[in-house]
C-alpha cells in the first residue's frame, strides 16, 4: 500500500509520466490492496471491543481528509474516501451484529462475496457479474451527492478516492 501511494503521489502530484500506472496491471494491484484492506478492516471490526469509537474515529478522519482536499486541492477532492467508508461500515455493522452473527460463516462468506461481485459495478448503473450487466438500475438513483455515498454517483460526481457503501460493504462484512 505504501509503494502504491508513493507512485500515486509521483504520478498525480508530481506529474511523473508513467503510462503503466494507469494500465490494467496497476489497476489489479490497486484493487488487491483495496480488497485486502477492507477485508481485514471488516474482520477487525467484528473482533473489536469498541467498534463505535473506532468507527467514529475513522469516519471523522475521513471527513477531515475530505475537508482538507476540498480546501487544498479542490480540483481533486476526496469524497467518500476509504476512511469515511470504513467508519460508516463499522458504525452500520454494530446494530447489525446480532443478525450477522446468526448467519453460518461459510454461507456468510459465499453471500457476501456473491453480493459484492453482483454490486461491483453499481456505480456504473447496473448489477451484474464480471462486467456483464444483468439489471440496469433506475437513473433516478444517481441524482446527488448523498446518493453517491450509497454507491449511486450523479454523472458530474468526482472524487480522487471513492469507496461507496455499495459494493464495498459486502466485502467488509
Please name every model-derived segment.
Residues 1-173:
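Alpha-helical transmembrane segments and their immediate juxtamembrane cytosolic regions
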Amino acid at each position: 500500500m505504501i509503494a502504491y501511494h508513493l507512485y500515486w503521489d509521483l504520478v498525480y502530484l508530481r506529474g511523473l509520466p508513467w503510462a503503466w500506472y494507469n494500465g490494467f496491471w496497476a489497476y489489479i494491484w490497486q484493487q488487491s490492496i483495496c480488497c485486502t484492506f477492507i477485508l481485514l478492516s471488516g474482520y477487525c471490526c467484528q473482533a473489536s471491543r469498541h467498534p463505535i469509537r473506532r468507527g467514529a474515529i475513522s469516519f471523522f478522519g475521513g471527513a477531515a481528509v475530505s475537508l482538507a482536499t476540498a480546501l487544498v486541492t479542490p480540483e481533486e477532492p476526496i469524497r467518500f474516501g476509504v476512511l469515511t467508508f470504513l467508519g460508516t461500515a463499522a458504525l452500520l455493522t454494530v446494530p447489525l451484529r446480532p443478525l450477522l452473527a446468526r448467519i453460518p460463516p461459510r454461507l456468510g462468506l459465499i453471500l457476501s462475496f456473491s453480493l459484492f461481485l453482483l454490486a461491483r459495478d453499481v456505480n456504473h448503473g447496473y448489477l451484474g457479474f464480471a462486467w456483464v450487466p444483468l439489471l440496469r438500475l433506475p437513473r433516478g438513483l444517481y441524482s446527488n451527492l448523498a446518493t453517491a455515498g450509497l454507491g449511486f454517483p450523479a454523472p458530474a460526481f468526482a472524487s480522487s478516492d471513492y469507496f461507496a457503501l455499495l459494493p464495498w460493504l459486502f466485502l467488509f462484512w
